[in-house]
Design a protein with these regions (language model features):
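Histidine-acidic metal/acid-base catalytic patches
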Residues: 1-166
Length: 166
């Protein structure tokens, strides 16, 4: 239970960082949120709670840990960032005080209702508005494709690359 581990480490002031990915069978390093978006939301709920309730915990370093074997790596990163933004925005909607009260009174039904209410909220319009206000692309993948960024990078760098492992 990753969100429980995150919560425990945050409350003890020991969570230094977090690698985001998704998996189907073991450590597949799939696009963040592609298989288990609700789990991603629950992890962010734990992060939000931990950041709000333990000033001793250092602000965790976050990293996307994915392997881009099938998809364009930049498109995969954009999809991962979208999933992260969406899960984080939804986690910010959770009424942490009510959730803590429901947990303390063992009201599992209310806990589920509070979490699922936030999870089912469509935050994509808010994320698009935020991007627009900061001068970013409302639809990053569409812009990336329209601007032919991949082709420009290939033209600039070439098709062949060598990984040395260093």
């Amino acid at each position: 239970n990753i969100e429980q581990i995150v919560s425990t480490l945050m409350l003890k002031g020991k969570l230094g960082g977090f690698h985001f990915n998704d998996s189907k069978y073991g450590d597949d390093d799939l696009t963040v949120g592609s298989i288990k978006p609700y789990s991603l939301f629950l992890i962010f709920n734990s992060l939000v709670y931990g950041l709000e309730n333990n000033a001793q915990n250092p602000y965790p370093a976050w990293m996307i840990d994915a392997s881009h074997n099938v998809k364009d790596p930049l498109e995969d990163l954009m999809q991962s960032l979208d999933a992260i933004l969406e899960a984080y925005a939804k986690a910010l909607l959770v009424d942490q005080i009510k959730l803590a009260q429901a947990q303390e009174s063992c009201d599992v039904t209310l806990c589920q209702e509070l979490l699922q209410d936030a999870y089912r909220t469509d935050v994509r319009p808010l994320i698009r508005q935020s991007r627009m206000q900061r001068g970013g692309a409302i639809d990053p993948i569409d812009s990336y494709r329209t601007l032919a960024v991949r082709k420009k990078l290939i033209d600039e760098r070439g098709l062949e690359s060598t990984a040395t492992g260093l």
